[in-house]
Amino acid sequence: MKFVFTKFLYVIILLTIHSIGVGGVCFGQSTGKTVFVSSTEGDDGNSGESADTPLFSIKKALTVGDTILLKANDVFYERVELRKGKISSYGKGRKPVISGYKRIAKANWGAIDEHIWRICLTNDNYTGYDTDGSSLLNNVGCLHEYDKDLIHGRKLKHLSDLAEDWDIWQTEHHKKGEATDCDFDTLYLYLNDNPNFLRIEFSVGGIALRMSNAIIENVRIEGFGFGISAGRHSIIRKCEIDAIGGQIQLNNSQYVCYGNGIEFWIRNGLEDCLVEECKISRCYDCACTIQGREPDPPSYIRYRNNVIFDCCQAWEDFFTTDNPDAIFKDCIFENNVIVNSGNTTGFGYTKGRTKCCHVLENNYLGNKGMIFRNNTFVGGNYYCAAKYNGAFKSGVWEGNTCYIKRGEWLIRCINKGDEIIRIPVEKGNFRTLKAATDEAIRRYREMTGDETTRFVIKSDGNINKRIKKLKKQYSKR
C-alpha cells in the first residue's frame, strides 16, 4: 500500500513539473485532441484524427483540436491565430512551411517607361497565398526569385523615386488612416532586365502567426510582413523564419517600412516566454525583439541558442514610455550566434538609414536591464543605442564575443547627434594602430559599461570566410 501511494505521489509531482515548465517558463501543455493537417493530401471534410485522414487547413484544424501536426514538406498558405495548444510537425523531410508568398503563374509585366514595369496584383494570375482581389495584404515587402532563392526590393515613397534595380513602389497613401485596399492593386518595379523572364513571387503583408499560451516547433515561416507576434506564455522552438518585412507600416504618421522576425509586444503582463534553437534570416528590421508599452514590464523572456543571419539587426528593444523606472525583468538574449547583421539582408534601404547593427536599443531613459550573455557576433556593426545623461548604458553585457572589421562601429548614437566610435583603420594621432584601437575600445567601455565583450579584429577576407563557414554549418540544421 505504501509503495502504491509513493508511486502515485511521484507521478503527480512529475505531471506538476511538466505542466508548469522548466526555469520559470510555462509550457502550457495542451490536453485536447491531436489533429493531422496536410496541404497535399488533406481535405477539411476529413476527421483529421490520423495521418491517413488529414485536414487541409490549419484554420480548420484549430477548430477541431489543440495539438496541430503539419505534414513535413508541405506548404500552407495562410495566417494563423494560435491562442492555446501546440503546432508541430509529423513525417520525414523538411519542416512544413507557413508561407506568405504569392507566385506569378504566367509572367505579365508591362513596361510603362524605360526600366519601369507594372503588374496587377488582383487578378487570378497567381498561385500560393490568395489575397482575394483588392487587399491591404497586397502591400508587397519583397520579390523572391524562387529558383535562385534571392530576395530583392527597396520600397520607396514616390513613383518618381524609382532609380535602381529592384526599387518598388505602390502608393502615395502611406500615413495612418489614408490607405485603402485598392492602393495596393498594382506594383511598380524598376529593373534594367525584363522581369517576364524571371521566376518571381511576392511576400504579402500581415503577420504570419499570432500566439499566446501556446507552443510552436519544427515549422518554417516565410514571406510575410511579420514572422511571429507573441504574447505571454509562448514557446517557439526549432523554427525557421526567413524573408520577413519590407512593407509600408500603415499605422504610422511617417513613411516607414517594417519587418521583425519574432516580436514580443509588451502588454497584458508579458511573461514566461522562450525562443530557442531557431534559425532567423533576411529580416528587413530585427530578427528578435521585445518592445511596447509599460506599466506592465516584461519578465522572464529568454532568447537562447538561436542562429541569426543577414538581418538588419539581430536584436532590438524599447519601451514606449517616459517612465525611467520601467525595466526588462530577467529578460536574456544568450548563447546565440549572430552573423552579418546590417550588410546583406537582400532588401534595399533608403539613404540615411543608420540602424544597421547587431544590437539596437531604442531606450532614451537609461539602463533598462536587458541582458546580453555569451553571444557570438560575426561581421557587422556592434551596438546602436540612445544616449542618456552622457552615456549609452542601456543593457547588461556578460561574456560576449564580437568578430569585427576595421571601420565598423562599436557604438553609434541614435539621438543627440550622430556620434560614432569605430574600430580605427588608421593610427591617427596615436603612435600605433594598436594604441588607437585600444583607445576606441576603452571609450566604448566607458560609455556603455560593457567591460566583458571580447573584440576580435579581423580582416575583411577573414570575416568573409567565417561568415561563409557559419552559413554552411548552420544550413544543415
Question: For each predicted feature, which ranges?
Answer:
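Classical Sec-dependent N-terminal signal peptides that target proteins to the secretory pathway
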Residues: 4-25
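Extracellular polysaccharide-degrading/modifying enzymes targeting complex plant/algal/animal polysaccharides
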Residues: 36-234, 245-259, 263-265, 406, ...
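Short glycine/acidic-rich loop motifs that flank beta-strands on beta-rich extracellular proteins
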Residues: 79-80, 205-208, 224-230, 245-261, ...
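Short "repeat-start/strand-capping" segments in structured domains, especially the N-termini
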Residues: 82-85, 212-214, 230-235, 271-272, ...
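Catalytic-core region of carbohydrate-active enzymes that cleave or remodel glycosidic bonds
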Residues: 373-380, 390-405
